[in-house]
């Protein structure tokens, strides 16, 4: 789920030696698709890729449900894969057309949200945590207290990404609840703490990579890859893993049921499961990818990056976000709607 978002953009790779013809429409999170990957794909296949950005799983879901979108592939987070499938918006994959499916790492091949990987393939995976400029705040950053009980040093300087599932879930874990909670006592604490904390936030925005790197913001609830990109430009920034609990996520590529360029979609999916090509995505976005052998082609700084390689002492607090039922989503949406007013 997760990334640094920009306004809608069209990234088109147009050069190359055509061994195939046509185009491909990819609907993906913003600032998440390597231009080098697209250029290489077009050079090798002759297929032109157009990437359209979205800013949240719910935005993508609503756009696809509305129809008439023209997209072939979408990249939802793990807890939305079953939703896309159940609504008939995506179709099972013909694995015979994906020989590189064998390159999916064993731990990502038979996952809870897609048994046997029959409807989705890995794009990137990571965590939700807190990026903090330690030159401004020197306290404990491995706690959601940083953004729910904002210390004086960070008041008016801390951003929160406007991602309902991530934010409500982090707050729920902080108050001792579980993901997708229907416990009204816990949810009241979540609602009250979010509303009390909001006046101390500078914004709820997706621009942490740029605004923390240039010093405009001092902290942000953020995704790990974005946080690494910030640190590479501003070395006083560190990434915290909330000890109360933090979500892990994986974004996966899915074939839409109304795709117009199905053959080209399969060509692209197979292409990105080649280790050296999966590494191009990771080197750009700064997340891990779930493809065996890709490590050999990745930027060496990622091999030891604390944002990418979860430190041993923080592993136990991580959990994969389940797909919430309708009632729990209603509760979260009610909290979120009030928070966003």
What kind of region is each of these model predictions?
Residues 129-136, 172-174, 250-261, 269, ...:
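A bilobed periplasmic-binding-protein/Venus flytrap-type ligand-binding module shared by bacterial periplasmic
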Residues 70, 75-216:
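Extracytoplasmic ligand-binding site segments that recognize negatively charged/polar headgroups
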Residues 103, 187-195, 233-259:
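Periplasmic-binding protein-like
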Residues 256-316:
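Mature extracytoplasmic/periplasmic domains
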Residues 21-84:
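Early extracytoplasmic/lumenal segment of secretory-pathway proteins
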Residues 85-92, 114-118, 229-241, 303-306:
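Ligand-binding "clamshell"
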Residues 210, 312-341:
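Conserved C-terminal helix/tail region of periplasmic/extracytoplasmic solute-binding proteins
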Residues 80-83, 213, 219-236:
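A ligand-binding cleft/hinge motif common to bilobed small-molecule-binding domains
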């Amino acid at each position: 789920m997760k990334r640094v978002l920009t306004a809608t953009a069209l990234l088109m790779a147009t050069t190359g030696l055509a061994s195939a013809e046509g185009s491909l429409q990819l609907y993906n999170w913003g600032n998440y698709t390597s231009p080098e990957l697209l250029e290489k794909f077009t050079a090798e296949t002759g297929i032109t890729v157009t990437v359209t950005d979205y800013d949240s799983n719910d935005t993508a879901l609503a756009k696809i449900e509305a129809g008439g979108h023209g997209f072939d592939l979408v990249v939802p987070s793990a807890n939305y894969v079953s939703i896309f499938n159940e609504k008939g918006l995506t179709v099972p994959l013909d694995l015979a057309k994906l020989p590189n499916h064998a390159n999916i790492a064993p731990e990502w091949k038979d996952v809870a949200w897609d048994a046997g990987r029959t409807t989705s393939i890995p794009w990137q995976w990571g965590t939700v945590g807190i990026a903090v400029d330690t030159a401004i705040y020197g306290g404990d950053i491995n706690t959601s207290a940083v953004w729910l009980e904002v210390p004086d040093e960070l008041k008016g300087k801390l951003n929160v990404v406007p991602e309902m599932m991530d934010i409500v879930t982090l707050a729920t874990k902080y108050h001792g609840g579980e993901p997708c909670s229907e416990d009204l006592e816990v949810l009241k604490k979540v609602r009250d703490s979010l509303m009390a904390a909001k006046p101390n936030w500078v914004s709820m925005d997706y621009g942490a990579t740029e605004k923390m790197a240039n010093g405009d913001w001092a902290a942000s609830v953020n995704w790990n890859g974005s946080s690494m990109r910030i640190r590479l430009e501003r070395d006083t920034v560190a990434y915290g893993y909330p000890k109360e609990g933090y979500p892990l996520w994986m974004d996966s590529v899915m074939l839409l049921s109304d795709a117009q360029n199905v053959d080209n979609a399969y060509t692209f999916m197979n292409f990105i499961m080649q280790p050296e090509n999966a590494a191009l995505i990771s080197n750009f976005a700064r997340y891990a990818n779930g493809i065996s052998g890709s490590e050999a082609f990745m930027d060496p700084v990622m091999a030891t990056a604390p944002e990418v390689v979860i430190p041993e002492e923080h592993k136990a607090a991580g959990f994969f976000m389940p797909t919430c039922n309708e009632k729990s989503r209603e509760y979260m949406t009610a909290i979120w709607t009030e928070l966003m007013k």
